[in-house]
Amino acid sequence: MLKPLLAISALSLLSLPACAQDTQTKPAPASAAQSLPFSPVIVSGDTIFLSGHLGRLPGSRDYPDGGIGEETRQTLENIGATLATVGASHSDLVRCQVFLADIADFAEMNTAYRKFFPANPPARTTVAVSGLAANASIEIECTGRVGHGDQ
């Protein structure tokens, strides 16, 4: 009984390198804090996992002027730039989670968000939280599927 179990375990271990080859990690952009322990995007098989993105201006720690609408727009622009590093776009997203520092920003956030997803938007959850990293007003995390936008 022990020999078959050991044989199955050994075969399972041999298949691990094949699984690892399906996962692609992209380094954080130069503007991101390099010391943080996460990847901005991981592709595993045909699934794209995006870490939470903020609306900082590229190459800066600053947020755009203009309130939550502009910060939402910049956040989604940053997501688009990250998606492009793995050959994807907003149309490949299937689910997003939006975190707002103030739920009163919900309507204005939706106005900006809608411009990026005029048809067939991804499934979405929006929640208000007591605080976000780097004093952001919004953070968006998404999951996508490679080639989803081609369908």
Can you describe what each PLM-predicted range is?
Residues 2-77, 81-94, 100-151:
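N-terminal presequence-like segments and the immediate start of the first folded domain
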